Amino acid sequence: MESTGMQSTGQRVVITGAGSGLGRELALRYAREGARLALADINDDGLKETRQLVADAGGWSFSQRCDVRDFSQLAALAQSCEERFGGVDVLINNAGVASGGMFWDLSLEDWDFQIGINLIGVVKGCKAFMPLLLAQGNGRIINIASMAAHIQTPGMSNYNVAKAGVVALSESLLAELQPLGIKVSVVCPSFFQTNLLDSYHGPDHQSKNDMAKLLESSPISAADVADITYRESEADHFMILPHERGRLALEQKRADPQVIYQEMFKLAARRLQQG
């Protein structure tokens, strides 16, 4: 466990998956607001880089290696936050991995890997910090999901299911925790410019190539998503949809889902033609 920067008296913020991508940008966004940060990841080098960037931005942080599949490591992170901060104001369950492949090509191990990190990792994160939040009677949980929870693109069924589960979990927590003074938000970005594919796990390369094209063509970056997440969660918005195209697609699905399904049929047919 290491710490850097000058400690402030701002919000106490925990971020999993803080070693790169959106997690890093969230750390920098909160650092600019004077937050005290607990940064967690399995990427030790990435954590070190994020910690230095936070310090350069005038923020204070400590880091702790944490695999979100291991509840004992998350519980240890919560204990460190209690010892160093005396509590937690914002918990951001951000750690996640990319995956893809047609359903018949995905193994049960592929499903276990994806669900274990992207869904159960969020469940365990919430569970590990819940005693602190309940004892405080306040705080905020921000779970990072995806537009894949709402618009299920072919060739990534296990990812779609995991992210849909995060949305369902977040809606459940929203209802259960609101009377107790604990706020909940869920963030559902479309693909954006980040290094998500570094964690790609799947049986074929076509899905990875398709994802790479979507990432490269995104009009917004991880820093943009982090800024939107900060602003909208502070405004107590529950469902945060950073991409305009994602918002429009969801509106279309609600109005006439068959239109979206027809687009998904075309995508699946194109994917099968590509092999």
Tell me what each language-model feature is.
Residues 179-244:
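SDR active-site lid
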Residues 26, 33, 151, 172-183:
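Active-site-adjacent segment of SDR/Rossmann-fold oxidoreductases
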Residues 102-103, 107-115:
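Substrate-binding pocket helix/loop in short-chain dehydrogenase/reductase
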Residues 19-20:
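Conserved glycine-rich cofactor-binding loop
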Residues 44-45, 65-76, 108:
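The beta1-alpha1 cofactor-binding region of Rossmann-like NAD(H)/NADP(H)-dependent oxidoreductases
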Residues 146:
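Residue(s) in the substrate-gating loop at a strand-loop-helix junction
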Residues 126, 162:
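Active-site helix of classical SDR
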